[in-house]
Protein backbone atom coordinates (compact mmCIF):
# COMPACT_ATOMS: atom_id res chain seq x y z
CA UNK A 1 0.00 0.00 0.00
CA UNK A 2 1.34 3.38 -1.01
CA UNK A 3 2.09 5.77 1.84
CA UNK A 4 -0.04 8.88 2.05
CA UNK A 5 1.47 12.27 1.32
CA UNK A 6 0.80 13.25 4.94
CA UNK A 7 2.76 10.25 6.25
CA UNK A 8 5.70 11.02 3.96
CA UNK A 9 5.68 14.59 5.22
CA UNK A 10 5.46 13.99 8.97
CA UNK A 11 8.06 11.20 8.80
CA UNK A 12 10.41 13.60 7.05
CA UNK A 13 9.87 16.16 9.82
CA UNK A 14 10.39 13.60 12.60
CA UNK A 15 13.58 12.28 10.97
CA UNK A 16 14.83 15.86 10.71
CA UNK A 17 14.12 16.41 14.40
CA UNK A 18 15.91 13.16 15.19
CA UNK A 19 19.02 14.19 13.29
CA UNK A 20 19.09 17.47 15.21
CA UNK A 21 19.06 15.53 18.47
CA UNK A 22 22.13 13.47 17.56
CA UNK A 23 25.64 14.70 18.38
CA UNK A 24 28.42 12.62 16.83
CA UNK A 25 31.76 14.40 16.86
CA UNK A 26 33.60 12.38 14.24
CA UNK A 27 33.74 12.24 10.44
CA UNK A 28 32.15 15.74 10.42
CA UNK A 29 28.80 14.19 11.42
CA UNK A 30 28.34 17.00 13.94
CA UNK A 31 27.89 19.30 10.93
CA UNK A 32 26.46 16.92 8.32
CA UNK A 33 23.58 15.51 10.38
CA UNK A 34 22.19 18.91 11.52
CA UNK A 35 22.49 20.16 7.93
CA UNK A 36 20.47 17.21 6.62
CA UNK A 37 18.06 17.55 9.54
CA UNK A 38 17.48 21.25 8.83
CA UNK A 39 16.83 20.49 5.17
CA UNK A 40 14.29 17.77 6.03
CA UNK A 41 12.52 20.04 8.50
CA UNK A 42 12.32 22.82 5.93
CA UNK A 43 10.97 20.62 3.14
CA UNK A 44 8.50 18.97 5.54
CA UNK A 45 7.05 22.13 7.04
CA UNK A 46 7.06 23.71 3.59
CA UNK A 47 4.34 21.29 2.55
CA UNK A 48 2.31 22.14 5.66
CA UNK A 49 2.59 25.93 5.60
CA UNK A 50 -0.93 26.43 4.21
CA UNK A 51 -2.69 24.13 6.70
CA UNK A 52 -2.92 26.39 9.75
CA UNK A 53 -1.12 29.16 11.65
CA UNK A 54 0.98 26.82 13.80
CA UNK A 55 2.34 24.84 10.88
CA UNK A 56 3.00 28.08 9.01
CA UNK A 57 5.01 29.29 12.02
CA UNK A 58 6.87 25.97 11.93
CA UNK A 59 7.74 26.61 8.29
CA UNK A 60 9.21 30.02 9.17
CA UNK A 61 11.15 28.49 12.06
CA UNK A 62 12.50 25.70 9.84
CA UNK A 63 13.68 28.24 7.27
CA UNK A 64 15.46 30.17 10.03
CA UNK A 65 17.02 26.93 11.28
CA UNK A 66 18.46 26.25 7.81
CA UNK A 67 20.06 29.72 7.74
CA UNK A 68 21.52 29.39 11.25
CA UNK A 69 22.85 25.90 10.47
CA UNK A 70 24.58 27.11 7.30
CA UNK A 71 26.11 30.10 9.08
CA UNK A 72 27.31 27.88 11.94
CA UNK A 73 28.98 25.46 9.52
CA UNK A 74 30.62 28.29 7.57
CA UNK A 75 31.98 29.88 10.75
CA UNK A 76 33.96 26.69 11.31
CA UNK A 77 36.23 27.81 8.44
CA UNK A 78 36.92 31.20 10.05
CA UNK A 79 40.08 31.30 12.17
CA UNK A 80 39.08 34.09 14.55
CA UNK A 81 35.45 33.06 14.94
CA UNK A 82 35.69 33.43 18.72
CA UNK A 83 35.41 37.19 18.17
CA UNK A 84 32.09 36.58 16.41
CA UNK A 85 30.92 34.20 19.12
CA UNK A 86 31.58 36.94 21.71
CA UNK A 87 29.17 39.37 20.02
CA UNK A 88 25.76 39.81 21.64
CA UNK A 89 24.16 39.51 18.19
CA UNK A 90 25.67 36.06 17.74
CA UNK A 91 24.66 35.00 21.24
CA UNK A 92 21.09 35.87 20.27
CA UNK A 93 21.42 33.87 17.06
CA UNK A 94 22.96 30.95 18.94
CA UNK A 95 20.10 31.02 21.45
CA UNK A 96 17.57 30.93 18.60
CA UNK A 97 19.42 28.02 17.03
CA UNK A 98 19.30 26.12 20.31
CA UNK A 99 15.62 26.69 21.04
CA UNK A 100 14.27 26.34 17.49
CA UNK A 101 14.14 22.50 17.46
CA UNK A 102 11.92 22.65 20.55
CA UNK A 103 9.80 25.42 19.02
CA UNK A 104 9.33 23.29 15.91
CA UNK A 105 8.18 20.34 18.05
CA UNK A 106 5.64 22.59 19.74
CA UNK A 107 4.47 24.03 16.41
CA UNK A 108 3.99 20.52 14.99
CA UNK A 109 2.07 19.40 18.07
CA UNK A 110 -0.19 22.47 18.18
CA UNK A 111 -0.73 22.32 14.42
CA UNK A 112 -1.81 18.68 14.57
CA UNK A 113 -4.01 19.36 17.60
CA UNK A 114 -5.80 22.12 15.75
CA UNK A 115 -6.46 19.82 12.81
CA UNK A 116 -7.78 17.13 15.16
CA UNK A 117 -10.08 19.59 16.94
CA UNK A 118 -11.57 20.54 13.58
CA UNK A 119 -12.51 16.87 13.26
CA UNK A 120 -13.96 16.71 16.78
CA UNK A 121 -10.98 14.69 18.04
CA UNK A 122 -9.38 15.50 21.36
CA UNK A 123 -5.82 14.78 22.50
CA UNK A 124 -4.17 15.34 25.84
CA UNK A 125 -1.43 17.90 26.27
CA UNK A 126 1.09 15.61 27.97
CA UNK A 127 3.35 15.75 24.92
CA UNK A 128 3.60 19.53 25.21
CA UNK A 129 4.48 19.19 28.89
CA UNK A 130 7.07 16.53 28.08
CA UNK A 131 8.70 18.82 25.50
CA UNK A 132 8.90 21.72 27.97
CA UNK A 133 10.30 19.56 30.79
CA UNK A 134 12.83 17.96 28.45
CA UNK A 135 14.11 21.33 27.25
CA UNK A 136 14.30 22.69 30.81
CA UNK A 137 16.39 19.71 31.94
CA UNK A 138 18.71 20.01 28.91
CA UNK A 139 19.15 23.74 29.60
CA UNK A 140 20.09 23.13 33.24
CA UNK A 141 22.59 20.42 32.29
CA UNK A 142 24.11 22.68 29.62
CA UNK A 143 24.53 25.54 32.11
CA UNK A 144 26.22 23.16 34.56
CA UNK A 145 28.39 21.77 31.70
CA UNK A 146 27.36 18.22 32.55
CA UNK A 147 29.41 15.58 30.69
CA UNK A 148 28.20 12.33 32.24
CA UNK A 149 26.97 9.33 30.26
CA UNK A 150 24.03 8.21 32.40
CA UNK A 151 21.91 11.35 32.18
CA UNK A 152 23.02 11.71 28.58
CA UNK A 153 21.40 8.39 27.69
CA UNK A 154 18.28 9.36 29.65
CA UNK A 155 18.02 12.65 27.73
CA UNK A 156 18.39 10.88 24.37
CA UNK A 157 15.82 8.25 25.35
CA UNK A 158 13.37 10.95 26.44
CA UNK A 159 13.92 12.80 23.15
CA UNK A 160 13.17 9.64 21.17
CA UNK A 161 10.08 9.11 23.34
CA UNK A 162 8.79 12.59 22.46
CA UNK A 163 9.28 11.90 18.75
CA UNK A 164 7.33 8.63 19.13
CA UNK A 165 4.50 10.51 20.85
CA UNK A 166 4.39 13.02 17.99
CA UNK A 167 4.33 10.14 15.52
CA UNK A 168 1.35 8.59 17.32
CA UNK A 169 -0.54 11.88 17.13
CA UNK A 170 0.25 12.13 13.40
CA UNK A 171 -1.12 8.62 12.87
CA UNK A 172 -4.23 9.49 14.87
CA UNK A 173 -4.75 12.54 12.68
CA UNK A 174 -4.57 10.38 9.56
CA UNK A 175 -7.05 7.91 11.07
CA UNK A 176 -9.40 10.84 11.68
CA UNK A 177 -9.58 11.40 7.94
CA UNK A 178 -6.95 14.12 7.50
CA UNK A 179 -5.64 14.31 3.95
CA UNK A 180 -2.72 16.56 3.03
CA UNK A 181 -2.96 17.92 -0.46
CA UNK A 182 0.21 18.40 -2.48
CA UNK A 183 0.51 21.90 -3.93
CA UNK A 184 2.71 22.90 -6.83
CA UNK A 185 5.78 25.01 -6.00
CA UNK A 186 7.98 27.20 -8.17
CA UNK A 187 11.21 25.83 -6.69
CA UNK A 188 11.44 22.09 -6.12
CA UNK A 189 12.76 20.54 -2.91
CA UNK A 190 15.80 19.20 -4.74
CA UNK A 191 16.69 22.67 -5.98
CA UNK A 192 16.28 24.09 -2.49
CA UNK A 193 18.62 21.40 -1.16
CA UNK A 194 21.14 22.06 -3.94
CA UNK A 195 20.96 25.80 -3.27
CA UNK A 196 21.64 25.28 0.44
CA UNK A 197 24.60 23.01 -0.36
CA UNK A 198 26.03 25.48 -2.88
CA UNK A 199 25.59 28.39 -0.47
CA UNK A 200 27.35 26.41 2.27
CA UNK A 201 30.21 25.45 -0.06
CA UNK A 202 30.62 29.07 -1.20
CA UNK A 203 30.68 30.25 2.41
CA UNK A 204 33.32 27.67 3.31
CA UNK A 205 35.43 28.72 0.32
CA UNK A 206 35.32 32.38 1.38
CA UNK A 207 36.03 31.42 5.00
CA UNK A 208 39.07 29.29 4.15
CA UNK A 209 40.58 31.67 1.58
CA UNK A 210 39.83 35.04 3.22
CA UNK A 211 39.55 34.30 6.94
CA UNK A 212 41.58 31.13 7.46
CA UNK A 213 44.75 32.99 8.50
CA UNK A 214 45.72 36.03 10.55
CA UNK A 215 45.59 39.44 8.90
CA UNK A 216 48.98 40.99 9.65
CA UNK A 217 49.70 44.74 9.65
CA UNK A 218 52.76 44.79 7.38
CA UNK A 219 54.80 48.00 7.06
CA UNK A 220 58.09 48.84 5.35
CA UNK A 221 61.05 48.13 7.63
CA UNK A 222 63.16 51.26 8.11
CA UNK A 223 66.82 50.95 9.04
CA UNK A 224 67.49 53.03 12.15
CA UNK A 225 70.13 55.76 11.94
CA UNK A 226 70.25 56.43 15.68
CA UNK A 227 73.93 56.89 16.72
CA UNK A 228 73.42 55.10 20.05
CA UNK A 229 71.77 52.20 18.25
CA UNK A 230 74.60 51.96 15.70
CA UNK A 231 77.18 52.04 18.48
CA UNK A 232 75.40 49.20 20.30
CA UNK A 233 75.23 47.20 17.07
CA UNK A 234 78.97 47.54 16.57
CA UNK A 235 79.58 46.44 20.15
CA UNK A 236 77.34 43.37 19.78
CA UNK A 237 79.05 42.38 16.54
CA UNK A 238 82.39 42.52 18.33
CA UNK A 239 81.00 40.06 20.90
CA UNK A 240 80.05 37.60 18.15
CA UNK A 241 76.39 38.51 17.67
CA UNK A 242 75.34 37.26 14.16
CA UNK A 243 74.96 40.20 11.77
CA UNK A 244 71.86 38.87 9.98
CA UNK A 245 69.97 38.34 13.23
CA UNK A 246 71.08 41.72 14.59
CA UNK A 247 69.49 43.52 11.62
CA UNK A 248 66.14 41.88 12.43
CA UNK A 249 65.96 43.27 15.98
CA UNK A 250 63.77 46.18 16.97
CA UNK A 251 65.48 49.37 18.08
CA UNK A 252 64.30 48.86 21.67
CA UNK A 253 65.90 45.39 21.81
CA UNK A 254 69.18 46.67 20.42
CA UNK A 255 69.35 49.56 22.89
CA UNK A 256 68.53 47.18 25.75
CA UNK A 257 71.82 45.42 24.94
CA UNK A 258 73.94 48.56 25.38
CA UNK A 259 77.27 47.73 27.04
CA UNK A 260 76.46 44.01 26.90
CA UNK A 261 78.97 41.77 28.66
CA UNK A 262 78.85 38.63 26.50
CA UNK A 263 76.90 36.83 23.80
CA UNK A 264 76.27 33.07 23.86
CA UNK A 265 74.90 31.40 20.74
CA UNK A 266 73.25 28.11 19.77
CA UNK A 267 72.71 27.40 16.08
CA UNK A 268 70.47 24.44 15.35
CA UNK A 269 71.35 21.68 12.90
CA UNK A 270 67.74 20.49 12.98
CA UNK A 271 65.21 21.88 10.56
CA UNK A 272 61.63 21.83 9.44
CA UNK A 273 61.29 21.48 5.69
CA UNK A 274 58.55 23.20 3.71
CA UNK A 275 57.73 22.68 0.03
CA UNK A 276 61.20 23.75 -1.07
CA UNK A 277 62.35 25.63 2.00
CA UNK A 278 64.09 24.89 5.25
CA UNK A 279 63.59 26.44 8.68
CA UNK A 280 66.67 27.57 10.57
CA UNK A 281 66.41 28.12 14.33
CA UNK A 282 68.95 30.07 16.38
CA UNK A 283 69.07 30.89 20.07
CA UNK A 284 71.11 33.63 21.73
CA UNK A 285 71.67 34.76 25.28
CA UNK A 286 73.05 38.28 25.80
CA UNK A 287 74.32 39.26 29.23
CA UNK A 288 73.25 42.86 29.73
CA UNK A 289 75.11 45.69 31.40
CA UNK A 290 73.69 44.80 34.81
CA UNK A 291 75.42 41.65 36.00
CA UNK A 292 73.15 38.61 36.18
CA UNK A 293 70.57 40.05 33.80
CA UNK A 294 70.18 38.45 30.37
CA UNK A 295 68.17 38.89 27.20
CA UNK A 296 67.21 35.59 25.57
CA UNK A 297 66.47 35.70 21.84
CA UNK A 298 64.94 32.93 19.73
CA UNK A 299 65.24 33.61 15.99
CA UNK A 300 63.80 31.71 13.02
CA UNK A 301 64.43 31.98 9.27
CA UNK A 302 62.78 30.21 6.35
CA UNK A 303 65.41 29.59 3.68
CA UNK A 304 63.13 29.25 0.67
CA UNK A 305 59.40 28.72 0.32
CA UNK A 306 57.76 27.31 3.47
CA UNK A 307 54.87 25.94 1.40
CA UNK A 308 51.29 26.55 2.47
CA UNK A 309 50.92 29.82 4.35
CA UNK A 310 48.23 29.54 6.96
CA UNK A 311 49.18 30.08 10.60
CA UNK A 312 52.50 29.74 12.39
CA UNK A 313 53.33 29.56 16.08
CA UNK A 314 56.41 29.94 18.20
CA UNK A 315 55.96 28.30 21.60
CA UNK A 316 58.69 28.93 24.16
CA UNK A 317 59.19 27.32 27.54
CA UNK A 318 61.36 30.06 29.03
CA UNK A 319 64.31 29.69 31.36
CA UNK A 320 62.38 31.28 34.23
CA UNK A 321 59.62 28.67 34.04
CA UNK A 322 61.48 25.97 35.95
CA UNK A 323 60.06 25.48 39.42
CA UNK A 324 62.58 26.51 42.10
CA UNK A 325 64.96 27.47 39.29
CA UNK A 326 67.66 30.09 39.28
CA UNK A 327 65.92 32.67 37.05
CA UNK A 328 63.07 35.16 37.29
CA UNK A 329 61.23 36.97 34.53
CA UNK A 330 62.31 40.54 33.91
CA UNK A 331 60.63 43.05 31.61
CA UNK A 332 58.21 42.43 28.76
CA UNK A 333 58.11 40.17 25.72
CA UNK A 334 59.30 41.67 22.44
CA UNK A 335 59.69 40.52 18.86
CA UNK A 336 58.51 40.91 15.29
CA UNK A 337 58.07 39.10 11.97
CA UNK A 338 59.84 40.13 8.75
CA UNK A 339 60.03 39.19 5.07
CA UNK A 340 61.60 40.52 1.86
CA UNK A 341 59.94 41.26 -1.46
CA UNK A 342 61.46 42.95 -4.52
CA UNK A 343 64.45 44.13 -2.51
CA UNK A 344 62.35 45.70 0.27
CA UNK A 345 61.96 44.40 3.81
CA UNK A 346 58.60 44.44 5.56
CA UNK A 347 57.83 43.98 9.23
CA UNK A 348 54.83 43.38 11.48
CA UNK A 349 54.16 42.75 15.13
CA UNK A 350 52.96 39.31 16.09
CA UNK A 351 49.20 38.91 15.99
CA UNK A 352 49.47 37.52 19.51
CA UNK A 353 52.52 37.60 21.76
CA UNK A 354 51.90 36.63 25.36
CA UNK A 355 53.00 34.51 28.28
CA UNK A 356 49.98 32.42 29.20
CA UNK A 357 48.71 29.61 31.36
CA UNK A 358 46.43 27.16 29.60
CA UNK A 359 44.78 23.76 29.90
CA UNK A 360 45.38 21.03 27.37
CA UNK A 361 42.84 18.30 26.70
CA UNK A 362 45.58 15.81 25.87
CA UNK A 363 44.77 12.49 27.58
CA UNK A 364 41.94 14.29 29.35
CA UNK A 365 39.68 11.22 29.10
CA UNK A 366 42.01 9.26 31.36
CA UNK A 367 43.88 11.87 33.39
CA UNK A 368 41.92 15.12 33.14
CA UNK A 369 43.19 18.38 31.70
CA UNK A 370 46.81 19.34 32.25
CA UNK A 371 48.05 22.76 33.36
CA UNK A 372 50.75 24.30 31.19
CA UNK A 373 52.49 27.65 30.81
CA UNK A 374 54.33 28.93 27.74
CA UNK A 375 55.15 31.99 25.72
CA UNK A 376 53.14 31.98 22.49
CA UNK A 377 53.87 34.08 19.40
CA UNK A 378 51.15 33.66 16.77
CA UNK A 379 51.30 34.98 13.21
CA UNK A 380 50.77 34.30 9.51
CA UNK A 381 53.32 34.63 6.74
CA UNK A 382 52.52 36.75 3.66
CA UNK A 383 51.13 34.97 0.60
CA UNK A 384 54.25 36.00 -1.31
CA UNK A 385 57.71 37.06 -0.21
CA UNK A 386 60.99 35.45 0.74
CA UNK A 387 63.35 35.23 3.70
CA UNK A 388 60.39 34.99 6.08
CA UNK A 389 61.84 35.36 9.54
CA UNK A 390 61.29 36.70 13.02
CA UNK A 391 62.28 36.50 16.65
CA UNK A 392 60.95 36.50 20.19
CA UNK A 393 62.95 38.00 23.06
CA UNK A 394 62.52 38.06 26.82
CA UNK A 395 64.69 39.09 29.77
CA UNK A 396 65.67 37.09 32.84
CA UNK A 397 67.48 37.89 36.05
CA UNK A 398 69.57 35.48 38.10
CA UNK A 399 68.35 34.50 41.57
CA UNK A 400 71.33 32.22 42.11
CA UNK A 401 74.63 31.67 40.34
CA UNK A 402 75.75 28.65 38.29
CA UNK A 403 72.37 28.00 36.66
CA UNK A 404 72.00 26.98 33.04
CA UNK A 405 69.98 29.19 30.74
CA UNK A 406 67.61 26.50 29.47
CA UNK A 407 65.01 27.83 27.04
CA UNK A 408 63.01 25.47 24.81
CA UNK A 409 61.23 26.34 21.58
CA UNK A 410 58.57 24.58 19.50
CA UNK A 411 58.00 26.02 16.03
CA UNK A 412 54.72 24.85 14.47
CA UNK A 413 53.94 25.34 10.79
CA UNK A 414 50.55 24.77 9.14
CA UNK A 415 51.19 22.76 6.00
CA UNK A 416 47.70 22.36 4.51
CA UNK A 417 44.38 24.16 4.31
CA UNK A 418 42.44 20.94 4.88
CA UNK A 419 41.16 21.02 8.44
CA UNK A 420 37.74 21.55 9.98
CA UNK A 421 37.01 23.33 12.15
CA UNK A 422 39.93 25.67 11.50
CA UNK A 423 42.36 26.05 14.40
CA UNK A 424 45.63 27.93 14.54
CA UNK A 425 49.08 26.42 14.94
CA UNK A 426 49.13 27.73 18.51
CA UNK A 427 45.76 26.15 19.30
CA UNK A 428 47.14 22.86 18.02
CA UNK A 429 50.04 23.15 20.46
CA UNK A 430 47.70 24.02 23.33
CA UNK A 431 45.70 20.89 22.57
CA UNK A 432 48.80 18.72 22.75
CA UNK A 433 49.75 18.75 19.07
CA UNK A 434 47.17 16.10 18.12
CA UNK A 435 47.00 17.38 14.52
CA UNK A 436 50.77 17.20 14.03
CA UNK A 437 51.83 15.42 10.82
CA UNK A 438 48.37 15.62 9.22
CA UNK A 439 47.82 19.41 9.29
CA UNK A 440 50.79 20.84 11.18
CA UNK A 441 54.50 20.14 11.50
CA UNK A 442 56.47 20.95 14.64
CA UNK A 443 60.20 21.11 15.25
CA UNK A 444 61.80 21.54 18.66
CA UNK A 445 64.99 23.36 19.57
CA UNK A 446 66.65 24.46 22.79
CA UNK A 447 69.01 27.20 23.89
CA UNK A 448 71.14 25.65 26.64
CA UNK A 449 74.14 27.68 27.77
CA UNK A 450 76.08 28.38 30.93
CA UNK A 451 76.57 32.03 31.91
CA UNK A 452 80.31 31.47 32.28
CA UNK A 453 80.39 30.88 28.54
CA UNK A 454 80.46 27.06 28.46
CA UNK A 455 78.15 26.15 25.61
CA UNK A 456 76.32 22.97 24.69
CA UNK A 457 74.80 22.45 21.26
CA UNK A 458 71.07 22.83 20.83
CA UNK A 459 68.81 19.85 21.13
CA UNK A 460 66.12 19.40 18.49
CA UNK A 461 63.78 16.81 17.15
Each model region followed by its residue ranges:
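N-terminal topogenic module of multi-pass integral membrane proteins
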Residues: 1-44
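Internal transmembrane alpha-helix with an interfacial aromatic "cap," most often the third helix
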Residues: 34-60, 76-80, 101-117
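Cytosolic juxtamembrane helix at the C-terminal end of the final transmembrane segment
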Residues: 46-48, 105-126, 158-185
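Structured domain cores in non-transmembrane regions
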Residues: 72-75, 79-83, 91-99, 304-385
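Membrane-proximal helix-loop-helix units in multi-pass membrane proteins
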Residues: 73-144
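A eukaryote-biased signal for long
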Residues: 203-227, 361-461
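Short N-terminal edge-element motif at the start of the domain
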Residues: 237-333
Amino acid sequence: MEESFWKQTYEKILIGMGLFGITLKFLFLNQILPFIGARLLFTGFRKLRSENRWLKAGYAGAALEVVITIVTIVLGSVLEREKIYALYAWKGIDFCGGILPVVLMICLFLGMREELEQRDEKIKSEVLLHIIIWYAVVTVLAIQEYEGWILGFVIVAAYIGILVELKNIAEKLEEAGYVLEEHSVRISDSRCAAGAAILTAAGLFVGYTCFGAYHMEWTTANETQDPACEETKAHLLSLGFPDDILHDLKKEDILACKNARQVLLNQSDDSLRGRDGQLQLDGLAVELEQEGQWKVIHHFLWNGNPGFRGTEAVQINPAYQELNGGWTSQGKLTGQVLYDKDGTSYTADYKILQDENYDTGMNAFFYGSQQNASIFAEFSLPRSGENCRGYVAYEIKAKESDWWIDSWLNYTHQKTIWQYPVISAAQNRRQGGWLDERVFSTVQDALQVLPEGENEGSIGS
